[in-house]
Structure formats: structure tokens, C-alpha cells
Swiss-Prot record:
This is Putative 8-amino-7-oxononanoate synthase. It is an enzyme of class 2 (transferase). Keywords: Biotin biosynthesis, Pyridoxal phosphate, Transferase. Its cofactor is pyridoxal 5'-phosphate. GO terms for molecular function: 8-amino-7-oxononanoate synthase activity; pyridoxal phosphate binding. Belongs to the class-II pyridoxal-phosphate-dependent aminotransferase family. BioF subfamily. Homodimer. Substrate binds at residues 25, 137, 356. Pyridoxal 5'-phosphate binds at residues 112-113, 185, 210-213, 241-244. Catalyzes the decarboxylative condensation of pimeloyl-[acyl-carrier protein] and L-alanine to produce 8-amino-7-oxononanoate (AON), [acyl-carrier protein], and carbon dioxide. Its EC number is 2.3.1.47. One of its GO terms (biological process) is biotin biosynthetic process.
Length: 395
């Protein structure tokens, strides 16, 4: 396609606007195995950018499980789970997820994004109302749009605003669904789950909780925010991913048998896509076993989180109760400059900018496999960089 084609000329104009606003993004290439230290664009750096909270993505046991599954079953599932793509391994993983979450059943999707898309659009339509937290993940927001339901947002974690919307609108719709992240991925704070459950019950409303950043991190056994708040076996829908603390790929929905059976028959993003590969499925299953058998991994993660929060809590830290720590900066230029300086000194903690978030920040993801030396080194460098860039009026 010629660059001068007038039909596509708007693309260059749009890109120029994105660059002018400092919103332009390009991927950075990692050429090593996942871990607390990675090789990024040829440079060895300590990795504070990964969602691999337990350090399992490079664990030999996950790798061996993936290899064994590939040798036994091939590289791909080769079809929809309803045609030629279903394997016993999928069923084993779903049972393991249900056991972890203490739900009746679970369903594995090819990604967490697809799990949210498919679930929300299957259980709601134009006769229904969806109320979502303002800071929800894109997959929750776009799944709601896809459903055709009326979609309203409430201010972040503002239960009074949510209640007011329900009092005003609930009676006008057949069914209603409240959607929320359990851990808000760009802030690190938690949803107010017990209160949300009480409101959902009062207004006869379904509740869907996205545990993407909670599973493997929070809860007595690592089951997530639902377990953390002692809300296990309450009437709700749990959605999550296998690609963060569990170190693999894919997504899941956990809930009642009726819900899961319904989704097998109505969730388009499960029905009309190839099943999760044997390698990814086996790796996720191995990760769940490790999560349950090695609680010390999660304990070490929280020790690392506590050290960082204690040392850096007065550096514009956004309130956090998770492995995601965000530090506010005045504008995208400051955030980009600080992210570049951190990288130059051997620490990968990227700048996050609008439109992904309302305000610019450095986002730090903590891992169980960060060593004490790496934690202390990061604290020292971060303090120096933050003092320099947070006060830079010329950026």
C-alpha cells in the first residue's frame, strides 16, 4: 500500500497527534528468559515491569510441563473446544481452577481479555444494565459495549455513586450486572468486595470480579481478592488470567455449574476460537500446583512489597494493597524521562501515561524472585531519580 494513498492518509495525521501528545508507544524487545533479571534491547536489567509476580514464567517445572504436553499432544489444539480442540488437559486445568477458587466449575479461555468479552456479552444484552467501575480494565469496558446493554460508569470505588445509579435505573431493566477489577491494575488498590456483594444482593444484581492481578497474590492460599475478603462461595462470577502470577497464557471464568454450562453454549469468544494450546494449558496447571504447594513464594513476594512500600511510600505512591506500586508524576514528559533514567541505570520500571491512565506515573511490579540486593538497589536509584524528575519544571 502506497504511503501517499489518500484513503489511508489520516493514519499519518493521527500518529503525528499521538506523538505530539507524548502518547506514542513502541515495544521494547526482551531477548532472554522471563525473570527478575532480563536482557532488554541488549542490556541486562532488573525487571520491575513484569506481571510474573511469583516468578513462575521461567520456572523449570512449567517449562518441563509445557514440553511434555507438546510432545504428547502437539503444538496446537487445532480447533474449537466444541469440535476437535478439547483435551483432557483442559478439563484438568478447569478442575484445578475450580478447586483453587472453591467454585462448582470453571471454563478456560484463550486469554483473560476473551474471557471478559465472552462472559459479559453472553449474560447481558440490550434489555439489561451494566454498571462498571471507572477504572476497570479495557476488557471489562469493551465487553460491556459488545453486549449491547446500557452501560454506565460509577466513580472509582464510590459505592454511594453506584447505589445512586441503581436506585435511579435498576427498575428499568430486566437484568443488571456490576463489573469491577479486584485489583486495579494501574493503581494497585482493591475493590470493596464485601460492600459490592451486599449492594448486588439488595438490588438483585449480578456481580463479576476480574481477578487478573489478584490470583496467586492475595488470599490465604493465593486464590485472590475473593478469598482475601472471605467472600468465597458467595454468588458472584470470577474472571481471571493465567498469564500473570501463574506464568502461562489464557483466561478463565469460575462460578456455578449453571453459569459455566451456559457459557459453553453462549460465549462466542470460547465457542468460535481454537482451544488453549497443550503447552500453555500444562504450564498453567503446573503453576497452580506450585502455588498450592509453595506458599513461601507468596510470602516472599509480600516481604518484597513491604520493603518497597516502607522505603518509597513518601514518593507520591498511589495507595496500593497489591504487588502493583505506582508513583505519580506531573506529566508524561517527567514520567518518560524518569523511566529512561531508571533503564539507563539497570532497572526496568516503565512510564505509564494517558490515555492508559488519567495521570502519568512510574508503575512498579514486584516479584517474589527479586533478591534483597535487587530490592535495595532499586530503592536507592529510584529515590535519586524521583528527587530529580518530580521537581523538574522544564520537562
Amino acid at each position: 500500500m502506497a504511503n501517499s494513498d489518500p484513503i489511508y492518509g489520516w493514519l499519518e495525521t493521527a500518529l503525528a497527534t499521538i506523538k505530539k501528545a507524548n502518547w506514542y508507544r513502541q515495544p521494547k524487545t526482551i531477548t532472554s528468559q522471563s525473570g527478575a533479571t532480563v536482557t532488554l534491547n541488549g542490556q541486562s536489567v532488573v525487571n520491575f515491569a513484569s506481571n510474573d509476580y511469583l516468578g513462575l514464567a521461567g520456572d523449570r517445572r512449567l517449562i518441563d510441563a509445557a514440553i511434555a504436553a507438546t510432545e504428547a499432544l502437539g503444538t496446537g489444539s487445532t480447533g474449537s473446544r466444541l469440535t476437535s480442540g478439547h483435551r483432557q488437559l483442559h478439563q484438568d486445568l478447569e478442575q484445578a481452577i475450580a478447586n483453587l477458587k472453591q467454585t462448582e466449575d470453571a471454563l478456560v479461555f484463550s486469554s483473560g481479555y476473551l474471557a471478559n468479552f465472552g462472559t459479559i456479552s453472553a449474560i447481558t444484552n440490550k434489555k439489561d444494565l451494566i454498571l462498571g467501575d471507572q477504572y476497570n480494565h479495557s476488557s471489562l469496558k469493551n465487553g460491556a459495549k459488545l453486549s449491547g446493554a446500557t452501560v454506565l460508569e460509577y466513580d472509582h470505588n464510590d459505592l454511594d455513586a453506584l447505589r445512586q445509579l441503581l436506585e435511579t435505573h435498576r427498575q428499568n431493566y430486566r437484568r443488571c450486572l456490576i463489573t469491577t477489577d479486584s485489583v486495579f491494575s494501574m493503581d494497585g488498590d482493591l475493590c470493596l468486595l464485601p460492600e459490592l456483594l451486599a449492594i448486588a444482593k439488595e438490588f438483585s444484581t449480578m456481580l463479576l470480579v476480574d481477578e487478573a492481578h489478584g490470583t496467586g497474590v492475595l488470599g490465604q492460599k493465593g486464590a485472590g481478592v475473593v478469598e482475601h475478603f472471605h467472600c468465597t462461595q458467595q454468588p458472584l462470577i470470577q474472571v481471571g488470567t493465567l498469564s500473570k502470577a501463574l506464568g502461562s497464557l489464557g483466561g478463565y471464568v469460575a462460578g456455578s455449574k449453571a453459569l459455566i454450562d451456559f457459557l459453553r453454549n453462549r460465549a462466542s469468544t470460547w465457542i468460535y476460537t481454537t482451544g488453549l494450546s497443550p503447552a500453555d494449558t500444562a504450564a498453567a496447571l503446573a503453576a497452580i500446583h506450585i502455588l498450592q504447594e509453595e506458599p513461601q513464594r507468596r510470602q516472599q513476594l509480600w516481604e518484597n512489597i513491604r520493603q518497597l512500600k516502607s522505603a518509597l511510600g513518601n514518593h507520591e505512591l498511589v495507595p496500593s494493597e497489591s504487588a502493583v506500586l505506582c508513583f505519580g508524576l506531573a506529566n508524561p514528559q517527567q514520567a518518560l524521562a524518569m523511566g529512561d533514567r531508571l533503564l539507563a541505570t539497570g532497572f526496568f520500571a516503565p512510564a505509564i501515561r494517558p490515555p492508559t491512565v488519567p495521570t502519568s506515573r512510574i508503575r512498579v511490579s514486584v516479584m517474589a524472585t527479586h533478591s534483597p540486593q535487587q530490592i535495595q538497589g532499586f530503592i536507592e536509584i529510584f529515590q535519586r531519580c524521583f528527587a530529580e524528575f518530580s521537581g523538574s519544571s522544564n520537562l
